[in-house]
């Protein structure tokens, strides 16, 4: 991880393939090969995306024989994004939003 943990998380989330990997992992663990099979890109490209997600602390990996199994590190994502939101949004706005009372933006 870098000296800017939030920065590494946002950089990792900036890529749509990495966001899709996280969404694919939301229901549970997947092997690297299972993840790669879901995308029309090369295995080495998926490996690089997984490496970036791992470096940002957004996925965990474990070995199962010769397979590498990945899962979402949801608490890391929640803490980082929650910390960022609380730093840039007024507390009252966050409280209203959590209660479902946030004003809806006007659509023109």
Name every feature range the model reports, one short phrase each.
Residues 1-5, 74-108:
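Amphipathic alpha-helical dimerization/coiled-coil segments
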Residues 54-64, 71:
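Beta-hairpin "wing" of winged helix-turn-helix
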Residues 37, 48, 54-55:
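Alpha-helical residues within the helix-turn-helix
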Residues 4-44, 66-77:
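N-terminal helix-turn-helix DNA-binding core of bacterial DNA-binding proteins
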Residues 29-30, 54, 85:
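Residue-level detector of secondary-structure transition/capping positions
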Residues 20, 49, 64, 68, ...:
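Positively charged, low-complexity intrinsically disordered regions
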């Amino acid at each position: 991880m870098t000296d800017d943990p939030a920065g590494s998380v946002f950089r990792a989330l900036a890529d749509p393939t990495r966001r899709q990997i996280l969404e694919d992992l939301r229901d549970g663990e997947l092997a690297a090969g299972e993840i790669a099979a879901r995308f029309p890109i090369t295995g080495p490209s998926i490996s690089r995306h997984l490496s970036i997600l791992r470096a940002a602390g957004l996925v965990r990996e474990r070995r199962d024989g010769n397979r590498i199994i990945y899962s979402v590190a949801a608490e890391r994502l929640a803490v980082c994004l929650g910390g960022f939101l609380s730093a840039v949004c007024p507390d009252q706005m966050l409280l209203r939003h959590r209660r479902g009372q946030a004003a809806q933006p006007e659509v023109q």
